[in-house]
């Protein structure tokens, strides 16, 4: 009797266990299915940009649920956990310049794995160039940024804006006195000095990761730029330079578009113009161009391809870029947006469009990580310590080569 009862209890337990397993399995499949339709996107953008993206991506509900998560340490976090599908995001919205780092880590998927390459022809060529690493496009461009030539109309009238660097130099000589400066910039910061170097056809770093600090063109740029630096304050920090312009102590500057709302809020009638042409070369000052857009992690491309494609296609809507231009002065990456009044009526956006004709996409190769410090030290030696340009450039070139070699 006891054996029959025990046998019956064991049978019931087995049935219960199997049923529980089946229920658990069904529940697990539901979770997995739901997870396939949830996309987490990391970003580091200001609220105005994030709100436009969020509003557009909410249109994908209920098919796709997008979690837009602001991450202040985005780049370092991706280096640490980008290969862990349990911790990493599915996509991230950021500038193009870290593409090479993450591609070499093996954590990125080419955009063309999901969107056919021919459909990307709607984007400006230089935005796609910025998004390309070793022949693969790893970013869907959304908007871009360049530095701008800005001036305070209280001092510099529209018809006085220098067309060439020699005109700018003359203006600086005539208007630099008594605590006022005709022109200021972060002259010893690589991101700003790059415009002068590029304008001389020099280079900080080539597309293949080779530094060009000791080239004839780069040395010529540093020597020419030095005479402008001599008419600027020695302090080159962001806060100091921008405060001089914002407070009306500097008549003009080269700065990012993010400065415009600040100086307007301060009551300035600010103008933006094309970069002055360098008399020595016939090229305008040609700053770096940073392209902001969406990137796809390999794990998401493999396991959530349908949801990822829907997100990408949502962000390919030109209205997103137009809305970003209106909300935050972002310059659209799509050519067609420049046919729309909402874009062409924005002088800051159109000034970036003009500057982009000659801007150089910031290098996206991993070697660029070591160049910022090397070039910063070079600029300090030349501009602030008065060291010989040629000798300093050659020493910086050797340092860069050694640091790059240690990376490989």
For the regions a language model picked out, list residue spans one by one.
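Extracytoplasmic/periplasmic substrate-recognition and gating elements
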Residues: 59, 65, 223, 230-233, ...
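Conserved N-terminal structural module of periplasmic/extracytoplasmic solute-binding proteins
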Residues: 2-7, 11, 16-100, 279-282, ...
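Periplasmic solute-binding protein
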Residues: 97-107, 125-163, 169, 186-207, ...
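A structural signal for short loop-to-beta-strand junctions that line the ligand-binding cleft
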Residues: 79-80, 87-90, 118-151, 181-182, ...
């Amino acid at each position: 009797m006891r054996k029959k009862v025990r046998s019956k209890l064991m049978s019931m337990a087995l049935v219960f266990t199997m049923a529980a397993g089946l229920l658990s399995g069904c529940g697990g499949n539901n979770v997995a299915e739901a997870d396939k339709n949830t996309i987490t996107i990391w970003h580091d953008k200001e609220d105005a940009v994030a709100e436009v993206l969020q509003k557009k991506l909410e249109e994908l509900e209920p098919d796709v649920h997008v979690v837009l998560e602001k991450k202040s340490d985005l780049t370092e976090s991706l280096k640490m956990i980008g290969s862990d599908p349990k911790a990493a995001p599915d996509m991230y919205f950021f500038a193009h310049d870290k593409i090479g780092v993450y591609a070499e880590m093996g954590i990125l998927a080419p955009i063309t794995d999901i969107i056919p390459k021919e459909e990307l022809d709607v984007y400006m060529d230089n935005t796609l160039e910025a998004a390309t690493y070793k022949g693969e496009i790893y970013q869907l461009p959304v908007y871009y940024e360049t530095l701008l030539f800005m001036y305070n109309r209280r001092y510099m009238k529209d018809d006085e804006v220098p067309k060439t660097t020699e005109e700018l130099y003359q203006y600086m000589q005539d208007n630099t006195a008594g605590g006022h400066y005709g022109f200021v910039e972060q002259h010893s910061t690589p991101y700003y000095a790059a415009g002068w170097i590029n304008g001389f056809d020099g280079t900080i770093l080539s597309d293949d990761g080779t530094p060009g600090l000791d080239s004839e063109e780069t040395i010529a740029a540093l020597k020419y730029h030095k005479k402008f630096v001599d008419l600027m304050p020695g302090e080159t920090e962001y806060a100091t330079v921008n405060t001089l312009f914002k407070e009306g102590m500097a008549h003009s500057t080269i700065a990012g578009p993010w400065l415009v709302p600040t100086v307007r809020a301060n009551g300035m009638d600010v103008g933006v113009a094309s970069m002055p042409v360098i008399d020595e070369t016939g090229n305008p000052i040609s700053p770096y161009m940073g392209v902001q857009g969406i990137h796809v992690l390999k794990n998401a491309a493999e396991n959530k391809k349908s949801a990822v494609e829907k997100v990408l296609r949502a962000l390919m809507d030109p209205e997103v870029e137009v809305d970003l231009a209106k909300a935050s002065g972002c310059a659209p990456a799509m050519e067609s947006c420049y046919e729309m009044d909402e874009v062409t009526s924005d002088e800051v956006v159109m000034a970036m469009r003009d500057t982009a004709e000659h801007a150089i996409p910031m290098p996206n190769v991993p070697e660029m990580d070591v160049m910022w410090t090397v070039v910063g030290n070079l600029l300090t030696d030349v501009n602030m310590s008065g060291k010989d340009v040629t000798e300093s450039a050659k020493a910086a070139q050797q340092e860069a080569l050694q640091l790059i070699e240690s990376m490989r």
